[in-house]
Amino acid sequence: MRVSDFTFELPDEMIAHYPQPQRSGCRLLSLDGETGALTHGIFTDVLDKLNAGDLLVFNNTRVIPARIFGRKATGGKLEVLVERVLDDKRVLAHVRASKAPKEGTELLLGDNESLKATMLARHDTLFEIRFDDERDVLSILDDIGHMPLPPYINRPDEEADRELYQTVYSERPGAVAAPTAGLHFDEPLLEALRKKGVEMVFVTLHVGAGTFQPVRVETIEDHIMHAEYAEVPQDVVDAVLACKARGNKVVAVGTTSVRSLESAAKACQDELIAPFFNDTQIFIYPGFEYQVVDALITNFHLPESTLIMLVSAFAGYKNTMNAYQEAVAEKYRFFSYGDAMFIRRNPFACKEKIS
């Protein structure tokens, strides 16, 4: 299967650089995976698409202000993007500089270069950095870090992004990108869903910068997926099994919830799903057989990305590419701050032939 099979033309003006004034006020394109039928609406229509007893699975990760600017003590400017917090003093990070810092290099970080740090070691493309400060890593990032807006949002981060690029239910700091499908849920919508009898549980997957990396191979089977840490606790497992037993739908809010649930199912030997606390490198593309997720709420994704491949595996390749063509024609807003889709799984997608 070729990466180029997943391309589509997207005018620049359809990339959303700011969210809608009201979280739940975005447009919603609904796709019935089994029939391919498309319907247009607004995000609050999800209330009508869910029944009492259905289970919404959210990702409660919280985005950290992971981008720091500074320089080497010797003078060269650099940009640090924290990928993973190792402990109270150390992080793994991407470093962009004219010349990569060597082991032992002293760094001066922050807009006023007030924070001293040391480059301890290099691990492939990531740098292990120690913050030489009495504060813990998360406090430091909160003080001097910038929100790590995706590369396709062509503007500097603003103070408002600290709230807007965060789900209202986020509580586990560690992500460097938001689980963007969840950005559309506000408290009134969540309360209306609860009143209807829709159940809610939370997984945690700390989204890494790898989610924005292009697929650099021609054949998708050759792609090596980046690793992200995920947690699927016992209460989620119990809720999923109970939902399936009563014949209701498990609805994943975002591709990160999909990857968490399906990772837990894949790692399980005897049951449908079991608790999971580990890194996952699950790569979902057409031919993948979903075990857990019945419906998916997701934003529109980049051409040739692993995420549009995941959606194609869920809804069917032809259905997905047709839906994206329709979204472009109808001028939907794309990517992190854009509009959303509600997709019912296509049970035949794993058998679909892609020419």
Curated annotation (Swiss-Prot):
UniProt function note: Transfers and isomerizes the ribose moiety from AdoMet to the 7-aminomethyl group of 7-deazaguanine (preQ1-tRNA) to give epoxyqueuosine (oQ-tRNA).
Subcellular location: Cytoplasm
Originating organism: Photorhabdus laumondii subsp. laumondii (strain DSM 15139 / CIP 105565 / TT01) (Photorhabdus luminescens subsp. laumondii)
Catalytic activity: 7-aminomethyl-7-carbaguanosine(34) in tRNA + S-adenosyl-L-methionine = epoxyqueuosine(34) in tRNA + adenine + L-methionine + 2 H(+)
EC number annotated for this UniProt entry: 2.4.99.17
NCBIfam families linked to this entry: PRK00147.1 (NF001140), queA (TIGR00113)
Pathway, per record: tRNA modification; tRNA-queuosine biosynthesis
Gene Ontology annotations of biological process type: queuosine biosynthetic process; tRNA wobble guanine modification
Bilayer-spanning residue ranges: none
Single GO molecular function: S-adenosylmethionine:tRNA ribosyltransferase-isomerase activity
A Pfam entry, by short name: Queuosine_synth
Enzyme class: transferase
Family note: Belongs to the QueA family.
Gene Ontology CC entries for this record: cytoplasm
Keyword Magnesium carried by entry: no
Protein name (record): S-adenosylmethionine:tRNA ribosyltransferase-isomerase
Keywords attached to this entry: Cytoplasm, Queuosine biosynthesis, S-adenosyl-L-methionine, Transferase
Subunit composition and interactions: Monomer.
